[in-house]
C-alpha cells in the first residue's frame, strides 16, 4: 500500500555551494515555433546541445552560392550539394550564468539576415531568434526586470532544430519575483505573433525565497561558517535544485567555488565531477552540526 507522507518541516539538498542558497529564481522554458516554411531557403538549421545552455556551436544549410556568402567573424562557409553550409562558433555558458557568452545560433540568424539569404517568411522568424540571442537579460524581447533580491531576469536560446520545414527555437528564462511565468508567456506570445512565431511546449517553475533571519537558515549558516572558519552570507541564484519542490527548503553545499581542483576533476554538473576527500569530511562535519542544531528548533 502506498501512502503520501506529510511535507517535511525543513530540508536541504547538498546540491549547490557553501555557505547556503536561500532563494532560486523561477525557471520558464518553452519554444518559439515557426510556421511550416514553403519553398524556403533554409534546408536545415540546428544548434546547441541543451535547453539550459547558451549554444556554442550551430550550423545551417541553405539554398545559396558561395558568392552570396561573404566572410564574417566566427562564421565558416563551405559548399555542399544544393547549397552552402554555414557554421558558427560561439562561447557557451549555463542559462543562469550567461554573462560573457556568444550564442552561435544568433550568429547564424544575424548572418542570414544581414546578407538577405532567406525568404521573407523565414526572415520574420529569424528576427525573433536574433532578439532572443542578442541579449541575455531580455531587453530585446521587452521582458527585462529586476526585483532587488535576485540578479536581473535572464533568458537564453539553447537549442534550435528544424523538422518538416518548421523551426523550433527554445528559450530558457530565469526570472525574479516581480514577474510571473504566465506574464512572461503573454509578452513572448504577443511578440512572437508579430514575427510569425507561436510559443509552445511551456514549462514553468516558480521562484522561491526564504528570509535569512529564519532560525533554520541561521542554524545551517552558523554551522557551516564555524566549521570552515569564515563569515559567509546566504546567496540567491538562477539555478534550480530539489529545494524548489518543497515548502521550506534550501540548498546547502557541498561546492566551494574558489577551491582549486586537480585537472582531472570536472566542475559541478560536468563530466568527471568530483569532490576532494578533505572537503567531503568537512561537509560531513557541517551537516552533523547543522542537523544537531536544527533538532533544537521548534518548528
Model-predicted segments: where are they?
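Midchain, well-structured core segments that form catalytic/ion-binding scaffolds
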Residues: 2-176
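Conserved beta-strand scaffold positions in the cores of enzyme catalytic domains, especially
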Residues: 11, 199, 249-251
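Generic non-transmembrane alpha-helical segments
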Residues: 65-75, 107-118, 187-196, 215, ...
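A short small-residue
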Residues: 87-94, 198-203, 264-271
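Substrate-recognition/cap regions that form aromatic- and gly/pro-loop-enriched pockets
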Residues: 162-239
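Zn-dependent metallopeptidase/amidohydrolase metal-coordination segment
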Residues: 163, 223-297
Amino acid at each position: 500500500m502506498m501512502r503520501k507522507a506529510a511535507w517535511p518541516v525543513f530540508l536541504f539538498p547538498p546540491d549547490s555551494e557553501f555557505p547556503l542558497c536561500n532563494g532560486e529564481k523561477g525557471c520558464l522554458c518553452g519554444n518559439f515555433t515557426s510556421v511550416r516554411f514553403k519553398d524556403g531557403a533554409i534546408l536545415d538549421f540546428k544548434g546547441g546541445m541543451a535547453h539550459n545552455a547558451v549554444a556554442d556551436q550551430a550550423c545551417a544549410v541553405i539554398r545559396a552560392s558561395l558568392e552570396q556568402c561573404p566572410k564574417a567573424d566566427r562564421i565558416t562557409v563551405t559548399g555542399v550539394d544544393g547549397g552552402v553550409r554555414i557554421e558558427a562558433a560561439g562561447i557557451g555558458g549555463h542559462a543562469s550564468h550567461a554573462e560573457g557568452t556568444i550564442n552561435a545560433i544568433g550568429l547564424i540568424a544575424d548572418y542570414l539576415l544581414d546578407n538577405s539569404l532567406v525568404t521573407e517568411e523565414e526572415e520574420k522568424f529569424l528576427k525573433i531568434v536574433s532578439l532572443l540571442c542578442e541579449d541575455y537579460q531580455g531587453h530585446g524581447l521587452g521582458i527585462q526586470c529586476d526585483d532587488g533580491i535576485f540578479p536581473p531576469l535572464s533568458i537564453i536560446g539553447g537549442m534550435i532544430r528544424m523538422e518538416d520545414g518548421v523551426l523550433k527555437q527554445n528559450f530558457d528564462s530565469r526570472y525574479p519575483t516581480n514577474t510571473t511565468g504566465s506574464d512572461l508567456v503573454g509578452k513572448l506570445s504577443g511578440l512572437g505573433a508579430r514575427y510569425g512565431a507561436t510559443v509552445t511546449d511551456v514549462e514553468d517553475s516558480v521562484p522561491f525565497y526564504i528570509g535569512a533571519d529564519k532560525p533554520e537558515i541561521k542554524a545551517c549558516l552558523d554551522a557551516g561558517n564555524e566549521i570552515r572558519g569564515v563569515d559567509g552570507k546566504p546567496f540567491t541564484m538562477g539555478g534550480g535544485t530539489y529545494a524548489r519542490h518543497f515548502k521550506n527548503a534550501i540548498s546547502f553545499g557541498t561546492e566551494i567555488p574558489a577551491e582549486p581542483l586537480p585537472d582531472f576533476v570536472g566542475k559541478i554538473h560536468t563530466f568527471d565531477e568530483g569532490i576532494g576527500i578533505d572537503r567531503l569530511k568537512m561537509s560531513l562535519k557541517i551537516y552533523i552540526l547543522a542537523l544537531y542544531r536544527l533538532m533544537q528548533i521548534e518548528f
